[in-house]
Amino acid sequence: MRPSGRQTHEMRGVSIETGFTRHAEGSCLISMGETRVLCTASVEERVPPFLRNTGLGWVTAEYGMLPRATHTRGRREAAAGKQSGRTQEIQRLIGRSLRAGVDRVALGERQITIDCDVIQADGGTRCASITGAWVALRLAVNKLMKAGDIITDPLTDHVAAVSCGLYAGQPVLDLDYAEDSEAGTDANFVMTGSGGLIEVQGSAEGAPFSRNALNTLMDLAEVGVAELVAAQKAATS
């Protein structure tokens, strides 16, 4: 039995509230169970130096957690004077995941930066960030297209992410913190709405896991991503 009482293939409740902030070109608050992430998209009519005069756009991301997003207060990284390795890893993951679903020629020579700020963490913050980031990006692109700044839709597919793992020997979908902290295997799957794989991150916390177990986790991930894509569609329609 899972601590939450969910079935092995059952997601936590998912909600996406769009237009959560006033100034960003796109924004949403995504909730996956008790995990909540604010995602905002900011459009700039410039690109990094390595892309100047190429005609290509850029999508990047930054990630952070509020000090009391977790059970005990974490020090602000700004106060520490540097980002942790975990933060850098996650924000790079978010950026490259989103770019996998973007036609950068159609985007034009502009940059969209997605900020993902974890308000409350209960497992799966990187997956919630990716899923919510796509919604914020979708809303920002819609605004650019409505203004006539972009003619062809640069978003080629939905992008969403979910965690799966082996908890008490059972493959389970969408781990919360209680499960993640005790899981024998933990994996994150980033996928497109059409079922393409963008990134798979998996590790054994104890004994190695089998290829069959990985296949089972991937099957669960497909179920979860389909549900998340449906939530994205509902939020942006």
From Swiss-Prot:
GO terms, biological process: rRNA catabolic process; rRNA processing; tRNA processing
InterPro entries for the chain: ExoRNase_PH_dom1 (IPR001247), ExoRNase_PH_dom2 (IPR015847), ExoRNase_PH_dom2_sf (IPR036345), PNPase/RNase_PH_dom_sf (IPR027408), Ribosomal_Su5_D2-typ_SF (IPR020568), RNase_PH (IPR050080), RNase_PH_bac-type (IPR002381), RNase_PH_CS (IPR018336)
The entry's keywords: Nucleotidyltransferase, RNA-binding, rRNA processing, Transferase, tRNA processing, tRNA-binding
Binding-site residues, phosphate: R86, G124, T125, R126
Documented EC number(s): 2.7.7.56
Single GO MF descriptor: 3'-5'-RNA exonuclease activity
Keyword GTP-binding part of the UniProt annotation: no
Pfam families: RNase_PH, RNase_PH_C
Reactions it catalyzes: tRNA(n+1) + phosphate = tRNA(n) + a ribonucleoside 5'-diphosphate
Keyword presence, rRNA processing: yes
Signal sequence region: none
Domain of life: Bacteria
Family annotation (Gene3D superfamilies): GHMP Kinase, N-terminal domain
Quaternary structure annotation from Swiss-Prot or TrEMBL: Homohexameric ring arranged as a trimer of dimers.
Family according to the record: Belongs to the RNase PH family.
HAMAP family: RNase_PH
Chain's role: Phosphorolytic 3'-5' exoribonuclease that plays an important role in tRNA 3'-end maturation. Removes nucleotide residues following the 3'-CCA terminus of tRNAs; can also add nucleotides to the ends of RNA molecules by using nucleoside diphosphates as substrates, but this may not be physiologically important. Probably plays a role in initiation of 16S rRNA degradation (leading to ribosome degradation) during starvation.
Protein name (Swiss-Prot/TrEMBL): Ribonuclease PH
Gene from which this protein is expressed: rph
